[in-house]
């Protein structure tokens, strides 16, 4: 009944989810405020515990954790081989990081004031780019982030015990 009400109130959604045979085979994923989406990263809890660190809850704390992952040998093998943050491309990681700067899209969003915003033209996006660049420059972001093409590449690194967050 709730889905039917939603469709009645939003005929454009019903039109987009109805196939040529007139049937709807799945529920539409509807989010009117992209900033409400959550993008998650997985963090190596064992490394946090080994280093006596708390789960980060701000972007600054996250940065400090990544630095500790890089410099304090949390996997305990005596080598500085840790990759603090890895990703296949930047898709999920980009959205996760951008959320700390107020956006989750590199396209168009509607602000709280109802105005349409092209995200790459905002000050917050510039701050995100500077932060991401800092992670890359300081070796906190995997150097292979732009060349890994499949999840298996990341899984292989993960199986070596060298990835702190992905």
What are these regions (language model features)?
Residues 1-166:
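Extracytoplasmic/secretory soluble proteins
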């Amino acid at each position: 009944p709730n889905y039917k009400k939603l469709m009645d109130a939003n005929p454009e959604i019903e039109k987009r989810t109805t196939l040529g045979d007139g049937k709807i085979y799945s529920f539409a994923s509807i989010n009117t405020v992209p900033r409400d989406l959550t993008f998650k990263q997985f963090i190596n809890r064992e490394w946090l515990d080994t280093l006596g660190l708390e789960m980060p809850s701000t972007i600054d704390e996250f940065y400090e954790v990544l630095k500790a992952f890089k410099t304090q040998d949390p996997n305990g093998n005596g080598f500085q081989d840790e990759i603090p943050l890895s990703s296949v491309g930047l898709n999920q990681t980009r959205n996760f990081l951008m959320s700390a700067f107020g956006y989750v899209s590199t396209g168009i969003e509607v602000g709280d004031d109802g105005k349409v915003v092209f995200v790459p033209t905002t000050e917050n996006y510039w701050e995100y780019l500077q932060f991401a660049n800092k992670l890359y420059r300081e070796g906190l972001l995997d150097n292979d982030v732009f060349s890994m093409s499949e999840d298996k590449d990341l899984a292989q690194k993960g199986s070596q015990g060298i990835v702190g967050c992905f």
